[in-house]
Structure formats: structure tokens, C-alpha cells
A protein has these predicted regions:
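Active-site loop of short-chain dehydrogenase/reductase
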Residues: 2, 27-29, 83
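A glycine/serine/threonine-rich, flexible loop-to-helix segment
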Residues: 3, 33-55, 94-113
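Catalytic tyrosine of NAD(P)H-dependent dehydrogenase/reductases that use a Tyr as the general acid/base
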Residues: 7, 15
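Active-site helix of classical SDR
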Residues: 10, 18
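Generic leucine side-chain signal with a strong bias for well-ordered alpha-helical environments
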Residues: 17, 25, 68-72
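Alpha-helical segment proximal to the catalytic Tyr-Lys
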Residues: 23-27, 78
Length: 113
């Protein structure tokens, strides 16, 4: 997407920092990061196009993130370090703005008209 340079750089920086810290702190602590997708903090249940665009068929909620954080803090994740875990319902695996559900990308080209 155009005009997302700062967002993209920040996301990349988090991933790189996670990897570097996992190496630097190896043997003392495990370091992982979580990159959430669309998370509704009002616990509203979205239907229609909002949910349909998600490969899992729903918008995420805070418990999706909390459950991963709890897992990463547990011994069950004892062999996981240096990972950036994407919790986005599969959105990073598909094109968001494909217009199947009426979603379009506003390029901003006509803003001065």
C-alpha cells in the first residue's frame, strides 16, 4: 500500500529488535513479539463484509492477543524465542483490498478536487 512507510518501518523495526534481543539475551530470557491485526476492543461481533474479509471469518478480540501472550510466558513455549507472532486471522496471507466485499483502496489522488 502506498503512504505506509512509517507503519512498515515500525513493524520491521519491532521484528528486527525482537530477533536481536533474543540473540543478545539468549540463555537468560526468551524474547518474542506479537503483531496483532484488526482487534476490536469493544468486543463487538462484526458481521457482513467486516468479518467476511477475514480468512477466519471474524474480527479479532483482545482475548486472542492475551491467550498468545499467556502461551508465550508458559513453559509450553520454552523453545520459542526470536519470533514475531502475527495474530491477524490470516490477513497477512491475502490481499486486503481486492474489492470482493466492497473494500477499496483510496489512493488520495483526488483529495484537492
Amino acid at each position: 500500500q502506498p503512504q505506509t512507510e512509517s507503519y512498515t518501518a515500525a513493524k520491521g523495526g519491532i521484528s528486527a529488535l525482537t530477533h536481536a534481543m533474543a540473540v543478545s539475551l539468549a540463555g537468560r530470557v526468551r524474547v518474542n513479539s506479537i503483531s496483532p491485526g484488526w482487534i476490536d476492543t469493544d468486543f463487538t461481533i462484526y458481521h457482513g463484509p467486516d468479518a467476511a474479509q477475514q480468512p477466519v471469518g471474524r474480527v479479532g478480540n483482545p482475548l486472542d492477543i492475551a491467550n498468545m501472550a499467556l502461551f508465550l510466558c508458559s513453559e509450553k513455549a520454552g523453545f520459542i524465542t526470536g519470533e514475531n507472532i502475527c495474530i491477524d486471522g490470516g490477513m497477512t496471507r491475502q490481499m486486503i483490498y481486492h474489492n470482493d466485499c466492497g473494500w477499496t483502496l483510496d489512493s488520495g489522488e483526488n483529495k484537492n478536487e
